[in-house]
Amino acid sequence: MLSPKRTKFRHQHRGRIKGISSRGNRICFGRFALQALEPVWITSGQIEAGRRAITRYARRGVKIWIRIFPDKPIRTRPAEIRMGSGKAKGSPEYWVSVVKPGRILYEISGVSETIARAAFQIVAYKMPIHTKFITSLRK
């Protein structure tokens, strides 16, 4: 699963997901892409599950680009600790990627549109949000 090798700070504020994605919202590498339609935190496990689904379905000849990276640490309160007293004090439990609407999640090339559409249908089922299949204009 994806996670940063090192970070400048150990903890991060949770923050709010406002607005739409102004970066990473166009197809840059592949021919077909999966685009997010809602704001969400996507965990490294969900990203990896999507990658595995594409490689299993599309088999040989597919090239995959993962356009998101989990760089936000999420901490949870340890077991048997009383509620309250500020933020969760534990070490990072898992990593998430902050995704705004319009962000490209995955891109693929080297397969036909029907195979790409079917592969992304499986991936979309594993994502916690509504997504959209889009095609690059260039051939």
Swiss-Prot record:
Q: Which CDD domains match?
A: Ribosomal_L16_L10e
An example molecular function term from Gene Ontology annotations: rRNA binding
Keywords tagged on the record: Chloroplast, Plastid, Ribonucleoprotein, Ribosomal protein
Tell me the compartments it is located in: Plastid, Chloroplast
Q: Name one GO biological process term.
A: mitochondrial translation
> Which Pfam families does the entry link to?
Ribosomal_L16
Where is this chain primarily localised? plastid
InterPro entries registered for this protein in UniProt: Ribosomal_uL16 (IPR047873), Ribosomal_uL16_bact-type (IPR000114), Ribosomal_uL16_dom (IPR016180), Ribosomal_uL16_sf (IPR036920)
GO annotation, cellular component aspect: chloroplast; mitochondrial large ribosomal subunit
Family membership, please give it.
Answer: Belongs to the universal ribosomal protein uL16 family.
Query: What do we know about how this protein assembles, alone or with others?
Result: Part of the 50S ribosomal subunit.
NCBIfam families xrefs: rplP_bact
Q: What is this protein called?
A: Large ribosomal subunit protein uL16c
